Design a protein with these regions (language model features):
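Active-site loop segments of alpha/beta catalytic cores
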Residues: 166, 170-269
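A solvent-exposed, charged loop/short amphipathic helix patch at secondary-structure junctions
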Residues: 146-161, 204-216
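Structured alpha-helical segments in the cores of large, soluble enzyme domains
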Residues: 117-120, 174-178, 221-232, 276-278, ...
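Catalytic-face loop-and-helix region of soluble metabolic enzyme cores
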Residues: 260-363
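Glycine-rich anion/phosphate-binding loops
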Residues: 102-119, 162-174, 304-309
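Active-site groove signature of glycoside hydrolases
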Residues: 132-137, 181-192, 325-330
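Alpha/beta catalytic barrel-like cores
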Residues: 1-136, 140-155, 253-260, 285, ...
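Active-site-proximal loop/turn and secondary-structure-junction residues that shape catalytic pockets
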Residues: 137-139, 193-195, 246-248, 268, ...
């Protein structure tokens, strides 16, 4: 794997190369999850996650989609929107003039989760210093929400603009509520953009399914992301990381928008993507590596194999072991499809992988 043949991402302007991160780089490799968690019990989820991901690792506020409508990632984020409302139709979440019962249900579920988090954290002898929360980013939000006529909001320039602005306005209140639940905790935000590559490529289907929507402009995508990321930082986020699938992942666009790092699975990363990640790490950015494949249903990979999946390309690119502290290891996807016992095992395995990377870093 060579780093001499580097081709810039077409979504990023030449003048907007990643600069030094504003967030402090971790001193050692750590572990976290991506948010989705099995079951319907926020108390059990919080206890397990905070128990398995104690310091220096990164516990997270669980998303529990098994509870139904409003606890899914899209509905949870839609409930944060300022001066915009949603309801649910047979084809999905729809923008409306007044909040529907599903939006109220989403807001209620989030309030419950924050109250439970406050209780669990308050009962700990030694509370975690960091906490991660997740939300859907403006591009995937526009792809997932529908207009009054049933078409995707992504189709309409004004709707895209209003959604990004509404989300940016709403995240401040959300982070203040999280901070009140866990006073003194350093907040990390994971912005999920599962549809970003499809938005940029023009492969999102219309409501009818017979056509696809026009490819989104990279410049507009970058500015929408920048607006939300800046709002998160202004609201107190210490780190903001963009998470997306690895296929056609717009790594340089994400960093040009101001992200402190990117989170993506390792399984299908190309040489070019590894080169982009190497440049980002050297510039002080973080890489959240989806080292643990949880999509196959097979037994979890061995710790040594997971460590090697990072170290081999890392070493081939000439990156020093000392920079392994810029890595957080994650599963390849959310854990909602696992059993609670399996999900717990995944978190334990991830902390072991982080330990293995730290041993390499120490030489």
């Amino acid at each position: 794997m060579s780093r001499e043949q580097h081709h810039p991402d077409p979504g990023a302007e030449p003048a907007a190369k990643p600069g030094p991160s504003t967030a402090a780089s971790p001193q050692e490799a750590t572990a976290t999850g991506l948010g989705p968690w099995p079951g319907e019990d926020p108390l059990e989820a919080a206890r397990i996650i905070r128990g398995e991901l104690g310091s220096p690792h990164l516990p997270f506020l669980a998303e529990l989609p098994d509870r139904g409508v409003g606890s899914d990632a899209l509905g949870r984020t839609a409930a944060l929107l300022e001066e915009l409302a949603v309801d649910v139709q047979p084809y999905g979440w729809r923008l409306v003039d007044r909040p529907g019962k599903e939006m109220r249900r989403a807001a209620s579920a989030l309030s419950t989760d924050l109250n439970v988090l406050a209780d669990v954290a308050g009962a700990e002898d030694l509370s975690a210093t960091d906490l991660k929360v997740q939300l859907v980013g403006p591009l995937s939000l526009a792809a997932g929400l529908h207009l009054h006529n049933g078409e995707r909001a992504l189709l309409d320039h004004g709707a895209r603009r209003d959604l990004a602005a509404s989300l940016a306005a709403g995240v401040g209140g959300y982070l203040r509520r999280v901070a009140a639940a866990v006073p003194g905790t350093r907040l990390v935000v994971q912005v999920d953009e599962p549809d970003i590559a499809a938005v940029l490529a023009g492969t999102i289907p219309t409501a009818s399914g017979y056509r696809t929507l026009r490819a989104g402009a990279a410049s507009e995508a970058r500015e929408s992301l920048r607006l939300v990321l800046e709002a998160l930082r202004a609201a107190g986020a210490a780190e903001v990381v963009l998470s997306f699938p690895e296929i056609e992942a717009p790594i340089e666009l994400a960093l040009a928008a101001g992200a402190d790092g990117v989170a993506l699975p390792l399984k299908a990363l190309t040489n070019r993507q590894w080169e982009q990640l190497a440049g980002a790490v050297e510039a002080g950015k973080q890489f959240w590596a989806g080292v643990l494949d949880v999509s196959s249903g097979r037994p979890l990979p061995k710790v040594a194999d997971c460590v090697d999946s990072v170290w081999r390309p890392w070493h081939q690119l000439g990156l020093p072991a000392s920079l392994l502290g810029s890595i957080r290891v994650t599963p390849s996807a959310g854990l909602a499809g696992q059993t609670p016992a399996q999900a717990t095992e995944v978190l334990g395995r991830l902390t072991q992988v982080a330990d293995g990377l730290n041993q390499l870093a120490l030489g």
